[in-house]
């Protein structure tokens, strides 16, 4: 992502570099690198063709910046659901099996869990009509509590709503202004154990 952010790599060349430089056969896209192209069919066709030309499978799209699916404000939460629908459509066109979303929101663990369960269920209902999974990564805050996130996913009651366990992202609270200083961390081994039963992809890390 640093290469993409630095402008040294165009999103359209991602599949080519993945295959030719690293010898890999699958890619996970980040929506931030084609933020205004979710409904741009010419662009999406180009992305799909380039992946196909290099024998690369489009696996999923990681979606950020589209609102909080765990927002306590119903109107804002439903707007977030609506904002994500276009990425479900784009992912389906590209041949992905999932979109990765965040279960973020403000409030107590119980308040955010209730809101996130509703928001994820609503988005997953739409995802189901498109044959698309909606998966949540442990991505800071309440979502980095494995038990909390597993219960949210379970309570949606949707088979296509799952997790994307990140093996190294179980920091619940960080020092303000210092991303590297974790103040509260969930046990990563327990967290992986909590989340794997609902996993439809993983973000594996090793030292």
Label every PLM stretch briefly.
Residues 191-195:
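Structural alpha-helical scaffold elements that stabilize or flank donor/cofactor-binding regions
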Residues 1-94, 98, 110-114, 118-121, ...:
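N-terminal pre-domain/capping segments
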Residues 152, 171-189, 201, 205:
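Extracellular glycoside hydrolase catalytic/binding regions
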Residues 6-9, 144, 183, 190:
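Residue-level signal for the nucleotide or nucleotide-sugar donor/cofactor binding architecture
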Residues 127-160, 167, 172:
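Basic- and aromatic-lined ligand-binding clefts that recognize polyanionic substrates
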Residues 61, 102, 137-139:
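Structural motif
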Residues 107-108, 141:
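Glycine-/small-residue-rich active-site loops that bind phosphorylated ligands and cofactors
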Residues 2, 107, 168, 172-178:
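Flexible glycine/acidic-rich beta-alpha junction loops that bind and position SAM and/or redox cofactors
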């Amino acid at each position: 992502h640093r290469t993409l952010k630095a402008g040294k790599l165009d999103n359209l060349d991602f599949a080519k570099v993945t295959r030719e430089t690293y010898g890999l056969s699958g890619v996970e896209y980040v929506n931030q690198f084609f933020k205004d192209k979710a409904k741009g069919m010419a662009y999406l066709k180009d992305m799909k063709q380039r992946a196909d030309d290099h024998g690369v499978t489009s696996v999923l799209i990681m979606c950020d910046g589209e609102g909080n699916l765990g927002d306590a404000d119903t109107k804002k939460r439903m707007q977030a659901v609506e904002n994500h629908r276009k990425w479900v459509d784009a992912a389906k066109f590209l041949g992905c099996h999932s979109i990765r979303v965040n279960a973020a929101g403000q409030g107590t663990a119980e308040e955010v869990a209730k809101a996130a369960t509703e928001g994820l269920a609503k988005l997953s209902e739409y995802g189901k009509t498109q044959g698309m999974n909606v998966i949540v990564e442990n991505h800071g805050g309440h979502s980095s509590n494995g038990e909390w996130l597993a219960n949210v996913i379970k309570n949606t009651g949707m088979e296509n709503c799952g997790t994307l366990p990140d093996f190294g992202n179980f920091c619940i609270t960080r020092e303000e202004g210092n991303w590297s200083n974790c103040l509260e961390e969930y046990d990563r081994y327990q967290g992986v154990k909590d989340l794997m039963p609902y996993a439809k992809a993983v973000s594996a890390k090793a030292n």
